[in-house]
């Protein structure tokens, strides 16, 4: 797995309380937590080749995806990636979030609808509200004394887990 190829400084590992105990995606959750306590680097040089195999050990991930490909009548019809439009919407949402962190009194619902359409805007508004984004925006605005600090606060709050939830919503 990807997690088997990670090198983690002991201080960072202790700061995030070690490997998360989950049924799947432990490496994703670990990297998500590590990104909040320090930089995550990508090693240069020879890459690690991960071979895939069919597996039902976990509810999602490479093993079940390989199983779907092998079970499909036409493997070319099985989606391998998230639709590119998801990332375009995600980019717009992050730009809006940056704007809102600088102007926390903005009408976020109106801007979501204006930039992303009524249906997507309403869905994202519900998800963000569920996460308590207004409180997060106020905190980011007050605590972030510089653009760099606000950006760091945004990336800490709007972490990889939340970004993936947005992609799955879309």
Task: Describe these PLM feature segments.
Residues 8, 30, 43, 48-50, ...:
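Generic structural hydrophobic/aromatic packing signal, biased to beta-strands
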């Amino acid at each position: 797995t990807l997690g088997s190829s990670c090198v983690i400084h002991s201080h960072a590992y202790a700061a995030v309380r070690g490997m998360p105990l989950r049924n799947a995606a432990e490496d994703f959750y670990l990297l998500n937590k590590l990104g909040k306590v320090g930089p995550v680097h990508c090693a240069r040089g020879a890459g690690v080749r991960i071979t895939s195999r069919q597996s039902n050990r976990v509810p999602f991930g490479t093993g079940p995806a390989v199983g779907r490909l092998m079970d499909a009548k036409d493997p070319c019809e099985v989606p391998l990636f998230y639709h590119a439009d998801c990332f375009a919407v995600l980019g717009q949402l992050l730009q809006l979030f940056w704007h809102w962190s600088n102007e926390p009194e903005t009408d976020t619902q109106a801007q979501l609808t204006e930039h992303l359409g009524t249906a997507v805007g309403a869905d994202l508004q519900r998800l963000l509200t569920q996460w308590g984004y207004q409180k997060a925006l106020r905190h980011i605005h007050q605590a972030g004394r510089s653009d760099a600090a606000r950006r760091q606060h945004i990336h800490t709050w709007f972490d990889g887990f939340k970004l993936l939830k947005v992609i799955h919503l879309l």
